[in-house]
């Protein structure tokens, strides 16, 4: 490492390297010359030693002056100078290619977390490369599914691929039989983790053959009694029981362990029968190449494995591998006739004597490139004739089955094949259940009203329900938005209905499941993606079981670590479960078997219940037996007599969840379910569940009966917000796609307003970009109108989608459908190149597979590291350059550095020493194609300078430190840059590798253009276009002919131009204006100001005019190079001057040019024509107006006074009349002496005021005040008072007081009062009675 050398040794090393050349040359010369050169060499060494001693202190100081350590480099001038293959401020990130020739060493991404977008390649070529190479993974932790370390056996990627490691990997070893290895690391932009540390050692096999064999030609030659790739498994050879036998409690019989006791089982009789046991099966012959995502099926005691994903360099992927579990022999089926394309993520089922293979992702090799595509092909394999035949579909519409799917599951029920879910590149995650009838050869879609989400790479098993129907259990899988689910659902094949079952609590996909002893056993899988703060398992070895009868999940005994994998398959044969293949960073071909626990090992009921590993037991008749769902078990006699009420047998453990589930399942409708405490209604499956659970899909759980739908309501349509793909949204007749709403782009047509049909009719017939959404230009339209517009634009016409399926599948026919019929953007799957793919934001281009996919489908499509890099719309501003740089077509790379970032390419440089060359496929030894003459192959390093054919390399040596400097001399052909890799200012093109730089074609309207695309940076405001050949709106001119674009300034208006430092105005440095004064004999005032933080501007003003009297046109410069600042200036041009003829007859025009400014700038400019003011006339008019104003004001004031007086008098009259209309009367009172007694019998009221209801009234009476025992009241005090009281009225009083008719005079009221008084007097009681 350079970081460990001393300054002196570094200096001496450089001198020795330089002198080696002279020594080799001197060997060919005569002896005297040699002596002379030795003398000079001695003088050089002496001088070097002296310089080193003097400079040692300063050099050491410079090396130690960096703030942070330089891990893979040296510190010079307070900065780290990195060694080859490293970069970063601390030389802590790997970069480019490195060749390692040591017999034993290590490689690493760096001491810290690896960098984003890393591409690092190590070529391990030990000196002893003729012997096998052992590669050991010491530590490894990267982002699961995104950041991979690829290991190849050989000196290039064209050798056999050994691994594609990601996630968290255990310590493991590999053997490169060729003695060489190429290791390539790729990371993306998102998450950066600890990385890896890998060591290697030459002349070793992996694990040293477990010390039970010898390494021969890269393979372990095992000793007797040991097998395996690394001799890691001991097998029995000698018959009978032996101390050296691997059989723990058994003996060897015909090469296998035969257990001597019924209490143990397993491959080596190592486990008691009360527990399940996993065993690795050692096949009798060599296993085939490892693979994953294959399709397999168990027929009798044979497993057929078809297709799958393989590593590069593996055997023929079309092979059909067959494994016999009884004989433990692998074999291949010889197939004749037509062959289907290689594929993975497909399914295979058996009906009668034929195998049916449907769907998956096909792989096509075209010119060293692999193209992948999802398919809906159905192939039939005749097991008798060993021939394939493709079944041609009868449906001719793309919106009918069969849909192309991958990652689905298939099940044979009676004479039909049920295809569950899967991913379709056009419609996303399919929620449909496709049904194929073997007899009629017709495809249909199950008509179900339940609303569920589609899934990818779930697991599914079929079983027979207690009612005799066949149901399919579907567990886990990946859904839209990269969501992994732990849900379990059941599909009834008779009623075509979905129902919800308890979740497992573990999110998995790419797992496998089988039905064993009443249990759904789920093995392995891939968990959630790794994030920066968590360590979720990328490869799982978890084994779960779901009790179908009890509806309970449980975890089985811990499986071996070697079982961590995904993409495998499992089958049940002879009461055992077999797991085959899969991926855990390596493609696996091993076979594991699960031997479930045996019920007979239990003797007590409690022991019987505890046996749950791979089986389900019940204690009946004093014995523990396997549970059979078709048998009705009864309770024992002892348990019956102990209880007052006999109970039926319950084989399940009554957990709180199960009790709640049992209670809720008794409710059959929404109202009763929601009314039950602790229960909720799932409308998607019309099922009642405990509210601790969740509805699998569709709307949320209903826990209030008031929210339940009506009993007689029609089944609801699938909610539009459950569709997350434009294609799936469009095939729903009640939905439409609204891309502006990012949260829920699929909306119901019922929510749209009919107010936008007019808008659509105006748009109809206009040219539209078919690749863009039709709502992209509706930002100014109200939301309701925009909704309806999309309803019209996206109106689905069934006639438009009728097309021959073969034509539809071709790329040339597909765009017309999606552009004209559904108005959806072209799907990612139909974009066939990088630039088209990245035009759509949600698309991602994978160069290594030549495939464009949706962002949400990346981890689904490339679960095994098939994508070595990817490009999206956010990868860079010049997307074409990024696409070119990431291409796997070597010939598209233009420089040596870019070429070597692709591990499959090398640089073939010509011998002109100018940097010209060709990037082609090759290995470290040379190109794969024939090498042309006069060329040199570079696989690790690059030629000096790399001047791209525009210069030659110049070499010089620095004074101190003595570092060789190689640089390009003056670049020619209008190029610039350290390697002449860019076009010089004023030119554009691709200067790399001899490219041509052309002058910017900007019609003299720009000084510079984009050096790559040639897009002109127009310097004149108002000029636009890639070639500055058009004028913007409101500007006039013809830039093509050299005439700039002018903006007209209307007279007597102020104009403000704000030019910002953005992409639009960043290069603007001038603006042209003009104004036409239309008033004759009126002065013209020109005013302008220029405010900019980057300096002042200059102004030029010209005036042109033509005379009506026949004189020639006249043009004169009014000002030139006049400085314009923030204060501005003002000029007045007098109309009386003969040189300024204004008015329509003279056709005078002012032309203004504001130039030499830098943005941002604000320009305020105006032309004004105001006639001179006649002050006498002004004051006369002003005085007249003022007098008129006073007169009018006086008149208005007088009118106001008159009106107010009239209103005041009128109000007074009304008040007097109102007071006069009040009831009043006079009365005479006779005061008797105190000693006298009145014969009248009592007082009479002075007045009576009846209430509104005439039932009571206020009686007012005169009251004599007390005198205090004297004859009269004291002097100054009144002797009388008026008192009032509320009293009831008699009928007679009411009759007198009743209100009279309208029109009765006020005098009548007074007479009524008198009558009342007389009535009161008559009714006074007689005291004599």
Swiss-Prot record:
What taxonomic lineage is listed for the species of origin?
A: Eukaryota, Metazoa, Ecdysozoa, Nematoda, Chromadorea
Keyword tRNA-binding attached: no
Cite a single GO BP annotation. tissue development
Q: Disulfide connectivity?
A: 66-75, 70-80, 82-91, 94-120, 144-166, 205-215, 209-220, 222-231, 236-252, 247-257, 259-269, 945-953, 947-968, 971-980, 983-997, 1000-1009, 1002-1016, 1018-1028, 1031-1045
Q: Where found in the cell?
A: Membrane
Q: Could you tell me which PROSITE patterns the record lists for this protein?
A: CUB, EGF_1, EGF_2, EGF_3, EGF_LAM_1, EGF_LAM_2
State the superkingdom: Eukaryota
Question: What is a single cellular component term in the Gene Ontology annotation?
Answer: membrane
Residue intervals of the EGF-like domain: 65-92, 204-232, 235-270, 952-998
Q: Which UniProt keywords apply?
A: Disulfide bond, EGF-like domain, Glycoprotein, Kelch repeat, Laminin EGF-like domain, Membrane, Repeat, Signal, Transmembrane, Transmembrane helix
For this entry, the protein name equals Putative protein tag-53
Q: Which Gene3D superfamilies does this UniProt record tie to the protein?
A: Kelch-type beta propeller (2.120.10.80), Laminin (2.10.25.10), Spermadhesin, CUB domain (2.60.120.290)
Which residue ranges are assigned to the Cytoplasmic compartment in the record's topology?
1197-1329
Q: For the Laminin EGF-like domain, which residue ranges apply?
A: 945-999, 1000-1047
How would you describe this protein's topology in the membrane?
Answer: Single-pass type I membrane protein
UniProt lists the gene as tag-53
What Pfam family is a match, any one?
Beta-prop_ATRN-LZTR1
UniProt key word Signal: yes
Q: In this protein, which residues make up the domain named CUB?
A: 94-203
Cite the SMART domains for this sequence: CUB, EGF, EGF_Lam, PSI
- Output the PANTHER family linked to this UniProt entry: DISTRACTED, ISOFORM B (PTHR46376:SF2), LEUCINE-ZIPPER-LIKE TRANSCRIPTIONAL REGULATOR 1 (PTHR46376)
According to the record, which residues are glycosylated? 103, 197, 208, 324, 395, 447, 481, 529, 555, 820, 832-833, 934, 973, 1066, 1102, 1147
**Which parts of the chain are Kelch repeats?**
302-353, 355-408, 416-463, 471-518, 520-575, 577-619
Q: Where are the transmembrane segments?
A: 1176-1196
């Amino acid at each position: 490492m350079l970081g460990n050398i001393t300054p002196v040794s570094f200096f001496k090393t450089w001198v020795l390297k330089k002198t080696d050349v002279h020594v080799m040359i001197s060997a060919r010369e005569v002896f005297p010359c040699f002596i002379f050169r030795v003398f000079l060499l001695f003088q050089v060494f002496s001088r070097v030693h002296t310089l080193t001693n003097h400079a040692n202190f300063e050099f050491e100081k410079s090396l130690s002056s960096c703030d942070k350590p330089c891990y893979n480099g040296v510190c010079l001038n307070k900065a780290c100078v990195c060694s080859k293959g490293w970069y970063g401020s601390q030389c802590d990130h790997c970069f480019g290619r490195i060749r390692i020739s040591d017999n034993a060493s290590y490689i690493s991404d760096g001491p810290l977390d690896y960098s984003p977008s890393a591409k690092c390649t190590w070529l391990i070529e030990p000196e002893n490369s003729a012997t096998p190479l052992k590669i050991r993974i010491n530590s490894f932790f990267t982002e699961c599914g995104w950041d991979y370390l690829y290991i190849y056996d050989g000196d290039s990627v064209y050798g056999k691929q050994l691994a594609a490691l990601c996630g968290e990997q255990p310590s493991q070893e590999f053997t490169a039989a060729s003695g060489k290895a190429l290791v390539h690391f790729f990371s993306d932009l998102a998450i950066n983790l600890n990385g890896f540390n890998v060591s290697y050692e030459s002349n070793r096999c992996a694990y040293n053959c477990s010390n039970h064999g010898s390494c021969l030609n890269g393979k372990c030659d095992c000793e007797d009694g040991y097998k395996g790739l690394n001799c890691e498994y001991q097998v029995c050879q000698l018959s009978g029981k032996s101390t050296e036998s691997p059989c723990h409690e058994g003996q060897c019989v015909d090469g296998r362990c035969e257990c001597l006791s019924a209490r143990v089982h397993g491959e080596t009789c190592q486990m008691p029968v009360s527990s399940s046991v996993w065993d690795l099966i050692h096949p009798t012959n060599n296993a085939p190449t490892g693979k994953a995502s294959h399709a397999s099926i168990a027929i009798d005691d044979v497993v057929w494995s078809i297709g799958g994903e393989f590593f590069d360099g593996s055997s023929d992927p079309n092979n059909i591998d067959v494994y016999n579990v009884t004989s433990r022999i692998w074999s291949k089926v010889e197939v004749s006739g037509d062959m289907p394309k290689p594929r993975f993520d497909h399914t295979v089922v058996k009906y009668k004597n034929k195998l049916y293979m449907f769907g998956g992702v096909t792989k096509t090799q075209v010119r060293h490139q692999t193209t992948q595509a999802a398919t809906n092909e159905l192939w039939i394999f005749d097991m008798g004739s060993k021939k394939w035949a493709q079944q041609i579909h009868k449906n001719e519409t793309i919106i009918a089955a069969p849909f192309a799917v991958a990652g689905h599951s298939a099940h044979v029920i009676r004479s039909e094949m049920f295809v569950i879910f899967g991913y379709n590149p056009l419609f996303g995650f399919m929620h449909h259940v496709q049904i194929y009838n073997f007899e009629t050869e017709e495809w249909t879609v199950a008509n179900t009203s339940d609303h569920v989400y589609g899934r990818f790479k779930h697991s599914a098993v079929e079983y027979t329900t207690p009612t005799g129907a066949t149901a399919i259990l579907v567990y886990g899988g990946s859904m839209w938005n990269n969501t992994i689910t732990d849900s379990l659902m059941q599909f009834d094949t008779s009623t075509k209905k979905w129902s919800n079952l308890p979740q497992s609590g573990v999110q998995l996909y790419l797992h496998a499941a089988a039905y064993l002893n009443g249990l759904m056993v789920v093995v392995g899988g891939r968990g959630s993606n790794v994030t920066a703060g968590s360590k979720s398992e990328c490869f799982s070895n978890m084994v779960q079981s779901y009790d179908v009868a009890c509806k309970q999940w449980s975890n089985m005994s811990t499986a071996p670590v070697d079982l961590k994998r995904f993409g495998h398959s499992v089958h049940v044969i002879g009461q055992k479960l077999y797991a085959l293949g899969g991926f855990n960073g390596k493609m696996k071909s091993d076979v594991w078997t699960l031997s479930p626990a045996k019920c007979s090992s239990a003797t007590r009921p409690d022991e019987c219940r505890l046996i749950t590993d791979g089986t389900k037991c019940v204690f009946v008749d004093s014995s523990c037996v396997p549970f059979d769902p078709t048998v009705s078990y009864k309770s024992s006699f002892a348990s019956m007599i102990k209880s007052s009420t006999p109970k039926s047998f319950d084989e399940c453990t009554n957990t709180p969840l199960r009790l709640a589930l049992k209670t809720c399942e008794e409710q059959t409708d929404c109202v009763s379910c929601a009314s039950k405490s602790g229960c909720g209604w799932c409308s998607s499956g019309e099922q009642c569940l405990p509210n601790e659970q969740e509805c699998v899909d569709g709307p949320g759980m209903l826990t209030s009966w008031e929210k339940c739908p009506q009993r007689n309501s029609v089944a609801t349509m699938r909610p539009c917000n459950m569709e997350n793909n434009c294609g799936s949204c469009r095939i729903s007749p009640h939905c439409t796609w609204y891309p502006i709403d990012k949260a829920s782009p699929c909306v119901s047509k019922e929510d749209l307003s009919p107010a936008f049909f007019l808008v659509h009719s105006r748009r109809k017939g206009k040219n539209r970009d078919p690749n863009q959404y039709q709502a992209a230009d509706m930002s100014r339209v109200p939301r309701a109108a925009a909704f309806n517009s999309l309803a019209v634009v996206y109106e689905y016409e069934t006639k438009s989608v009728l097309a021959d399926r073969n034509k539809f599948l071709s790329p040339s026919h597909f765009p017309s459908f999606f552009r004209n019929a559904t108005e959806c953007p072209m799907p990612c799957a139909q974009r066939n190149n990088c630039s088209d793919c990245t035009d759509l934001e949600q698309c991602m281009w994978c160069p290594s597979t030549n495939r464009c996919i949706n962002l949400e489908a990346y981890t689904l499509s490339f679960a095994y590291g098939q994508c070595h890099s990817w490009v999206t719309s956010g990868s860079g501003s010049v997307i074409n350059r990024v696409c070119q740089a990431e291409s796997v077509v070597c010939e598209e790379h233009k420089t040596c550095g870019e070429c070597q970032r692709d591990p499959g390419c090398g640089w073939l440089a010509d011998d002109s020493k100018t940097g010209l060359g060709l990037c082609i496929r090759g290995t470290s030894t040379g190109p794969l194609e024939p090498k042309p003459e006069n060329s040199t192959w570079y696989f690790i390093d690059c030629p000096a300078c790399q001047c791209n054919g525009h210069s030659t390399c110049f070499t010089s040596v620095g004074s101190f430190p003595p570092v060789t400097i190689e640089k390009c001399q003056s670049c020619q052909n209008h190029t610039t840059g350290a390697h002449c890799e860019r076009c010089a200012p004023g030119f554009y093109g691709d200067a790399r590798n001899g490219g041509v730089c052309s002058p910017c074609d900007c019609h003299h309207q720009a000084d510079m253009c984009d050096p790559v695309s040639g897009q002109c940076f127009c310097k004149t405001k108002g000029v636009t276009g890639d070639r500055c050949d058009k004028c913007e709106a409101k500007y006039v001119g013809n830039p093509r002919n050299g005439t700039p674009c002018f903006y007209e300034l209307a007279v007597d208006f102020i104009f403000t131009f704000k030019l910002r430092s953005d992409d639009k105005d960043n290069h603007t440095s001038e603006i042209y204006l003009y104004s036409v004064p239309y008033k004759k004999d009126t002065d013209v005032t020109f005013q302008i100001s220029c405010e900019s933080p980057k300096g002042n501007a200059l102004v030029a003003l010209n005036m042109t005019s033509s005379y009506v009297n026949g004189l020639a046109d006249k043009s004169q410069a009014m000002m030139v190079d006049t400085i314009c600042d923030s204060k501005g200036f003002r000029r007045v041009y007098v109309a009386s001057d003969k040189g300024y003829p204004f008015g329509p007859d003279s056709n005078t025009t002012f032309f203004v040019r504001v130039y030499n400014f830098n943005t941002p700038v604000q320009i305020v400019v105006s032309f004004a024509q105001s006639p001179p003011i006649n002050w006498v006339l002004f004051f006369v008019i002003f005085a007249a107006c003022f007098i008129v104003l006073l007169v009018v004001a006086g008149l208005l004031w007088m009118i106001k006074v008159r009106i107010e007086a009239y209103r005041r008098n009128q109000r007074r009259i009304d008040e007097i009349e109102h007071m006069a209309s009040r009831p009043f009367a006079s009365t005479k009172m006779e005061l008797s002496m105190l000693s006298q007694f009145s014969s009248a019998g009592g007082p009479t009221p002075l007045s009576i005021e009846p209430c509104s209801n005439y039932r009571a009234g206020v009686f007012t009476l005169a009251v004599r005040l007390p005198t205090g025992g004297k004859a009269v009241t004291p002097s100054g005090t009144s002797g009388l008072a008026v008192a009032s009281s509320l009293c009831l009225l008699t009928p007679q009083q009411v009759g007198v007081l009743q209100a009279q008719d309208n029109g009765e005079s006020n005098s009548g009221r007074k007479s009524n009062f008198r009558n009342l008084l007389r009535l009161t007097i008559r009714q006074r009681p007689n005291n004599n009675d």
